[in-house]
Amino acid sequence: MPRSMKNDNFIDKTFTVMADLILKLLPGVSSEQKKAFAYYRDGMAAQSEGEYAEALENYREALALEQGEEDRSYILYNMGLIYQSNGELDKALEYYHQALELNPRLCSALNNIAVLLHHKGELSLQAGDEETAEALFNEAAQYWIRAIRIAPNNYIEAQNWLKTTGRANLEVY
């Protein structure tokens, strides 16, 4: 039984049953696509329970089967989330960048890249490397600006940071 069916949550079980029914009824959905979706769904279930190794395994299987670029971008993004949660920031950045290559309008990936770059900038500042910190802050600003241009009502803290640091070279309203 797939992990997603083991969940005791009624809403999750209902979603899983509905998703399975939709997949069965949709014409043109290959068995590979169905398998990819099942692995992705099981990866999300494992990730939500903090079972990151299992989630990554499912995401890798889904990635091997999935053909659609947008769907692949979300798989890569979720893998980045896991690496970020585990403190593997450089690896998380790699996965977020891969997700953006497939889906340049994935705001959450843009935001997470900016957050990680800002964090690295703070670490550089603490280490006394102001030049590297400034470069990282400027790079973070560029990612936040891209995200804000796509979703102007989001990332209010980032917008405030951009304004207070003089890096806001855009009008979003």
From Swiss-Prot:
This is Photosystem I assembly protein Ycf3. Keywords: Membrane, Photosynthesis, Repeat, Thylakoid, TPR repeat. It is found in: Cellular thylakoid membrane. PROSITE patterns: TPR (PS50005), TPR_REGION (PS50293). GO terms for biological process: photosynthesis. It comes from Synechococcus sp. (strain JA-2-3B'a(2-13)) (Cyanobacteria bacterium Yellowstone B-Prime). One of its GO terms (cellular component) is plasma membrane-derived thylakoid membrane. Belongs to the Ycf3 family. The lineage of its organism: Bacteria, Bacillati, Cyanobacteriota, Cyanophyceae, Synechococcales. Gene3D superfamilies: Tetratricopeptide repeat domain. SUPFAM superfamilies: TPR-like. It is a peripheral membrane protein. TPR repeats lie at residues 36-69, 73-106, 121-154. Essential for the assembly of the photosystem I (PSI) complex. May act as a chaperone-like factor to guide the assembly of the PSI subunits. It comes from the Bacteria.
